[in-house]
UniProtKB/Swiss-Prot annotation:
GO terms for cellular component: axoneme; ciliary basal body; motile cilium; radial spoke. Belongs to the CFAP206 family. Keywords: Cell projection, Cilium, Cilium biogenesis/degradation, Cytoplasm, Cytoskeleton. This is Cilia- and flagella-associated protein 206. Essential for sperm motility and is involved in the regulation of the beating frequency of motile cilia on the epithelial cells of the respiratory tract. Required for the establishment of radial spokes in sperm flagella.
């Protein structure tokens, strides 16, 4: 059958089963129906052959079997499957959840962002409208207050005007779209930091909840509630296990317990325990993050107070980074609030799938079968065989791992979620926790633990036999596929959450490693002083910078009255007399010629006797 035709047939089967269930008053999701279809086909007792095309009679039989299972409300196995499907569809690890949450926020702000970045305002009214949109954007992005609250809007407007006055809108409009978006985010963080600081000083903070106080109350309360439910579930597990362990050696008791479906109830509550541990682990991680962020928040607020004090003006280079850091921390606290809420909601919604264990196995019947049985906790079982260890010499062809010889011993992915494979196979499905201290068997790149040394030896003699038994048991009880993490053996049952974390299934032990040593070329540390300055004026500049004279009050002026009290003088270098001359004026004079002529007057008859007298001064006399 072509893939497209097969998918069409499966969809029609799922749709038909959903309609039949609805007719019987049971609303079932398509995901659960699809899981049940796979489970019914996988069960060998139903006789479906995956290698041949399904006939009409096969489809009718498949629908009938699925209907029977889905409408059997007294079956713990169905409750376990419902719990697994719900958890897989609703649980996401912290990192991916926060990434998706931020992506959703960005998509919701997309229309507001485009209205601002695509705006081409020119008139005064248009610029005022744009500024109001920026205020709304800051409020929506920060999540601190409602845009319809007048007091909150006024507070945000005042904070925004202090860092981004309306007069700067012209410069903002000239930026590229990417730069506008970046500046909007920066403005949001700065304004958020200002509001948080004002709230801490008691001068503002309208509409801002005290998130650290809320989380410090909510997280411990949630952890305490989950711890209580976890201990209650474990107590029930230990009682079920004790009865099943007692029945393993008593055929009559096994036959008597058959109608109560005790093993299915054990699988149900074990799966519930696993999910509670996952939720509790995430909440503990969140509590550690909140504690660290609360300390950082207080430190940044104190740093701001020391920087600002009572000053009228402070350089933006000093306070803006702190405001941004405050905003980032507060956003992380908001994320933690959402994570805790989602995990609490998930915890509440999986409780109904725990099943009515009182209905499955009444207390009077349980007390009757507990007579003569020893109820042991998982910790007690591990302590009993803590000293019993596998002798590696007994199995030369198999590899055994121990804590003292394996570097990443605690990080190995143990098969069957750490339960003893031999006990499960030998007792037809009893779940007992394995003890890694006995030794971890490495077989075909997979790791197995056992609850006792004898169980380890029995499994090691024929591993394939017991692995096949576990696989066949999982085909009959499909809830075991997720409970025992058998997804690699049943590819069609890999949940989405497991597919995302597929890489973690291949952690390999580090039992051997290469190491080398080498003497350092330079034993002594270098003596180069990077802060050395040869320039005297550079040293003076640094000294002035360290003194921060801009924030100090200096006195260098005296009045007529104050000069009598003390002398005030400043001097850079010792005084010295010196003079320089760049040009000197000088001149020279040549004697002016003075020559006189006499005897030029005379008659016509007389001869003129001309006398020439030279009165010019000598050059040496000048």
């Amino acid at each position: 059958m072509p893939p497209t035709q097969a998918e069409s047939v499966i969809r029609s089967i799922i749709r038909e089963i959903g309609q039949e269930c609805a007719a019987h008053g049971e609303i079932v999701s398509e995901t659960l129906i699809a899981f049940m279809v796979k489970a019914v086909v996988l069960d060998p007792s139903n006789g479906f052959n995956m290698d041949r095309t399904l006939m009409k009679s096969d489809v009718q039989n498949l629908v009938k079997l699925c209907m029977t299972r889905l409408l059997d409300t007294k079956n713990p196995s169905l409750d376990t499957i419902k719990m697994q499907v719900y958890f897989d569809m609703n649980y996401t690890n912290r990192v991916e959840f926060l990434e998706e949450h931020h992506r959703v926020l960005e998509s919701r702000l997309g229309s507001v962002t485009r209205e601002i970045t695509d705006n081409r305002a020119c008139a005064k009214e248009e610029l005022e409208s744009l500024y109001r949109k920026i205020i709304s954007y800051v409020l929506l992005r920060s999540g601190l207050g409602s845009p319809t609250d007048i007091k909150t809007v006024r507070e945000v407007t005042a904070a925004l005007q202090s860092v981004f006055p309306q007069a700067e809108l012209g410069t903002f409009l000239t930026l590229s779209k990417k730069d506008k978006e970046r500046q909007l985010k920066e403005l949001t963080m700065i304004v958020t930091g200002i509001r948080l600081f004002n709230r801490d000083c008691g001068k503002g903070g309208e509409g801002i909840d005290d998130l650290p106080a809320v989380l410090h109350v909510a997280i411990p309360a949630t952890m305490q509630h989950i711890d209580y439910q976890l201990e209650t579930a474990r107590s029930q597990v230990y009682r079920y296990t004790a009865i099943l362990e007692k029945a393993a050696n008593d055929p009559l008791m096994r036959a008597e317990l058959q109608p109560y479906m005790l093993k299915e109830a054990l699988y149900n509550i074990r799966q519930y325990e696993v999910f509670l541990q996952i939720i509790l682990s995430d909440i503990i991680t969140g509590a550690q993050e909140v504690e660290m962020m609360t300390k950082q928040l207080g430190a940044h607020l104190e740093q701001l107070k020391m920087t600002i004090k009572s000053k009228i003006a402070v350089p933006t280079s000093q306070v803006f980074p702190i405001f941004i850091a405050l905003s980032t921390l507060w956003t992380s606290l908001q994320d933690e609030t959402i994570v805790v809420g989602v995990l609490s909601n998930l915890f509440t919604h999986i409780q109904p799938f725990l099943g009515a264990h009182e209905l499955y196995f009444p207390e009077r019947v349980m007390q009757c079968h507990l007579n003569g049985a020893t109820v042991k906790t998982d910790v007690c079982r591990m302590k009993e065989h803590m000293e019993d260890r596998v002798n590696v010499a007994d199995f030369r062809k198999l590899e055994w791992l121990f804590p003292e010889t394996t570097a990443n011993f605690d990080k190995l992915l143990i098969q069957y979620r750490g339960f003893c494979a031999y006990t499960f196979a030998a007792t037809d499905g009893l779940l007992l926790p394995g003890n890694p201290a006995i030794g971890i068997l490495k077989y075909k790149e997979k790791y197995y633990t056992f609850n006792s040394k004898d169980a380890a030896y029995s499994f090691a003699e024929n591993p394939e036999h017991y692995i096949d038994i576990v696989r066949e048991k999982a085909k009959k009880n499909t809830e075991l596929i997720q409970l025992l993490e058998l997804h690699q053996q049943f590819e069609t049952f890999i949940p989405y959450s497991q597919m995302r974390d597929a890489d973690k299934h291949y952690i390999k032990p580090i039992t051997k490693c290469e190491s080398s040593t080498q003497t350092n070329t330079h034993i002594l540390p270098p003596t180069i002083v990077r802060s050395y300055e040869w320039n005297e004026w550079e040293l003076r500049r640094k000294a002035i910078k360290l003194a921060n004279l801009r924030q100090k009050v200096t006195h260098s002026v005296q009045t007529d009255l104050s000069h009598l009290r003390r002398e005030n003088c400043s001097q850079v270098y010792p005084p010295k007399d010196t003079s320089t001359q760049s040009m000197r004026e000088d001149s020279t004079g040549v004697p002016r010629p003075q020559i006189y002529l006499a005897g030029l007057r005379g008659g016509k008859s007389e001869i003129t006797d001309e006398v020439k007298v030279n009165l010019t001064r000598d050059v040496d006399e000048t």
